[in-house]
Amino acid sequence: GDGMNVFASNNVLFDGVFCRNSDDCTTVYATRMGFHGGCRNVTMQNSTLWADVAHPIFIGLHGDVERNEVMENLTYRNIDILDHREMQVDYQGCLAINAGDNNLVRNVRFENIRIENFRQGQLVNLRIFYNKKYCKAPGRGIENVLFKDITYNGDHAELSHIVGYDKERMVKNIRFENLKINGKVISDDMTGKPAWYKTSDMARFFVGEHVGDIVFVK
């Protein structure tokens, strides 16, 4: 089952944890299982995650569609991800934010995260979606997300996805700073990138519709 779940809580710190789980290692959700409200000021640091199924880090799925809840000021730093194995494409992503149930997810920081050669899945999955199995509505947005000093060494990563829902429910203001894949820093001005390529192509990221202001810098 899941590891460290946060439902409708504020001012939470996980420091120095090791999670090996047969589902999500750590999650942040809004209203869920009798707990009501959004989430603010959640930090996980100096920790190690191993997901035999589903996500190492997962944010945003559950909430109260009538309340338009917010999950904000979430920080993940100095983390080792040892494994990720998920056959279902909808539930892949080492670093995953999937906004559902009219949730807004904003001000998220992933920093100094080392990802090993996991078995099956995606590096990043940012989506606003309507998953009818678990949600009653799509999310409202994902915005202001920083990925800083993220490294991945391996050859099992499938195509990552960054996709909004419509012009009112967008993924926006996403910054990758010193994203390093197999020793190569992915940046908008990187050497060897054909002029007609998107920078995201160099990382094997699919950037779909309703995504705004995504940058890759050294």
Describe the residue ranges of each PLM region.
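Extracellular/periplasmic carbohydrate-active domains that bind, remodel
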Residues: 1-218
